[in-house]
Amino acid sequence: MNNILVITGARGIGDLIYQLPLLRSLYLTYKTKLILVSNKVNKAKDVYKHEDFYDEIIEFDHTRYSTIKTIGKIKYFLDLINRYNSDLTILTSNTTRLMLPVYFSNSKNKIIFGTKKFFIFKDKTNNYLTSSEKI
C-alpha cells in the first residue's frame, strides 16, 4: 500500500498515546509511513514529534457547529481526504461528521472503528468505554 491515511477525532493527548501501538503496527506491517489527520486541539505534532511512523500530520477543526456550517465542514473534510488518494483510510472515531466524508471519499479501502454494517447505525455495545479504550 502506498498511502495510508489515519484519521483520529480524539481530543485528548491520552487518546493519542493509546493509539501509538496501532500506528506503529500499521507502519511495520505495511512498510510505509502514515499520513495522520488529527484534531488540532490534541497537539499530535508535539506528541508524535520523535516518532518515525508518519510522513505528515494534518490538523483539522473537529468542533461542533450549526447544521449548515457542519455541512460545509464535511465537504471541506471530504476534499481533504480525497487530496491524498489513499489506498487505506482508517477512522478511529465513529462521529457522523467524520464518518460521512470517509464513506464518500475516493479511498480504495476504508475502516471505521465502532460502526455496524450500515454506517448510520453505530455500534453502541462499548459505549461505557473511553475513545482510547475502544481502540
Predicted features along the sequence, with ranges:
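Catalytic machinery of carbohydrate-active enzymes
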Residues: 1-135
